[in-house]
Amino acid sequence: MTSIAGVDAQTIEELRIASKECLDRGLLVAAKWSSELLLSISSTKRNLVRSGGSLATFSTSTPARSLSPAPPLHSFVEQSPTSPRIATQPAFQGPVPNLPLSQQVLETGTGNLPANTPEVQEDDSITAARACFEGREFYRATHILEKCTSSKAKFLRIYCQFIATEKRAQRDWHKLDNNRHQPPLPINEFLNRLLDLVKDSTDPWLLFLKALFLSRLSRREEAMESVLLSISGFKWNWSAWSLLGSCVGDGEELSSLLHLIPLPLDHPLVQIFQIKTLNELHNPSDHEISLCDRLLGPDFFPNSLWLMSMRACALYHLHDYGQAERQFEKILALDPNHIDDIDIYSNILYVQDNRLKLSKLAHEFLALDKDRPEICCLIGNHYSLRAEHEKAVKYFRRATQLDRTYLSAWTLMGHEYVEMKNSHAAIEAYRRAVDVNRKDYRAWYGLGQAYELLSMHHYSLHYYQRATALRPYDVRLWQAQGMCYEEIGRVQEAIECYKRALIPADPHEITINLKLARIYRSLNEHSEAVAYNRRVIEVCQADSRPVQDYAKSCLEVADYEMRVPDGDLNLAREYLELVAGSNAEDVGRAAEMLKLVKSMIHNRAAILPINRAETLFS
């Protein structure tokens, strides 16, 4: 199987058609995504294709494959919540839909369809309905398309009905604000009726709607099967990929799903899907960075700000804040008005404690659009870094009012309440985050912290375990679990957690080693305690740290060597001399122990010749 060498004429034409088809159906974010991806291809290639030329250097045969993460349903006016995760994988079985009209659109474009097709004959009605859609008159658009029979008109009619009923469900839900009878999420009672309208469809766009309704009804497996069928019929509908990603529970499930996608593994769409989904799962790796670099190469989409943003987000999740910051700076240099993922950039500046740059960014973007949730989060981070937590909460709450499904805002609001020692409000914010997306470890971790503030360690432990299951290589989560186990007296489990934390920890880390040494000492397992103290000393000396950082470990090792038979007294003396000659707080104790160890060395030296003589004459 030949791998894809780059973007070819067919890909360029498909992106052009996808932009128009998505726009005609009201999938605005999908249309924006495909058109921006098209613009990221060099104008020379695009113009050559438009003029009927040939991209000989970009000819391709069958593409190969890759892995990816789950974006939210950005293409929907009301973003639907994530369906609950289930363990089994959907089987991609059943026929690929027979979609002659869709294929004709891909080959010729909508404008070249025969005049007798329903879509062409209903074009005036579709145009009028699209105008109503743009004016957010969804019921009126539905009425205009009531007697239309083409698949495009049917899609737009049902999609308008969906948006209208979602808005109604939102209004009814908000009527119960601050009421204990308010359900966790809005309930759309019309979903089953809408599903009945598309349940037997074979059109890829209607299959997408079917998958959307199934996902909202928490029928995840069926939703995944329908969206895979939709992708097989029209692969450049980004909303379908977003919906598919929202159904993915973890990295393992994603790996299994990739083999069910009806595209080669190295197809750009599959690789883009992998990058986005793993970012959404907060679990990218260096492999995703290399995929971004490949797709940003001259043969693919060298000017794609979206891919650059995905690369920056992956670096952020990998805690490479310096490179992530430089990537965002490059994005803003190319487009100073680029708002997407600006909240991630603000998180990076927050972590780096870069107050000046964060303040400048906040003032610049507040002037651009104060009603974007990303910008509200940016302003919230700005106030949080200045320790103005009440103002930070105000802006994070504003972000959730603009988009109830905006996960970061709920999580950051919870963090602010923790800073304010308002555990109950923090728990409420984190629970809202979990309701939006159960795959985000940060909300589970936040719940654990909030319950820890209330000294409810069993509850904390439960939530830390949920977070660890989603992010098994995060040092903080294992440390948090270990501390909870210590608090409830389950010392052996605490030891296991701290040992597990050492696996992904920085090789120069000493805190966890010190905790393990302390626990083993409390259990009178002195040899184990000394082993971890020696590790602390080795790391500190290799890093040329001040003696104060490892003085206690030196004393512990020296004390052990002085107590055990045939202990290494010279090593004990070396460590004690280090501490005694420093300005550590244990200087006095080190000086006393040094006198004792010198006496022991002298006595051992005196006894040794006698023992040798006895051995010779025995």
What is each residue range found by the language model?
Residues 26, 136, 165, 218, ...:
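Residue-level detector of the short coil/turn that links helix A to helix B
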Residues 133, 162, 215, 279, ...:
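Position-specific recognition of the canonical hydrophobic site in helix A of tetratricopeptide repeat
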Residues 150-155, 203, 237, 267, ...:
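Residue-level recognition of tetratricopeptide repeat
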Residues 153, 206, 240, 307, ...:
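TPR alpha-solenoid repeat register
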Residues 231-232, 297-299, 332-333, 366-367, ...:
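Conserved structural position within tetratricopeptide repeats
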